Amino acid sequence: MDKPVVINGCFDLLHEGHLGFIRLASLVGNGVIVFLNSDASIRKLKNRSPVFSDQHRAALLRSNYYVREVYIFDEETPVHLMTRLVESLNPGMYLTSTEHIDSIVVKFMQSKFIPVLYAPRFSNFPSTTSLLAKIRALPEGQNPAG
């Protein structure tokens, strides 16, 4: 496919599961466009502050070979920003996880006739939530890597 693939998420504590998801997106399209939750959006969505700022997370994502562009949004979902950008971006597909089958973003993409591909969760990699729990459980001064 000549067109880019759109993904979205928080990407806080970027880990192997995130990287696998980005790589998968790159395999089905020409470049990856990321809609990234802002710090305020994460606070609304998860009732906690992100570990890294949206600017830091965007810089990490932009450094990924497959990522073409990163757009930061303040709402709980990127639909308002996508509404403004989807025509100019002309994505060929939206990739999301099977956890978001009925999401407002999926419905929006379908309304724009953009195919939606569902990826299974990379369960062999820890989630950001489990990584944060592991870090919080460490005795003070202990290295999280072991």
Annotated model-derived regions:
Residues M1-G146:
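Nucleotidyltransferase catalytic core that binds NTPs
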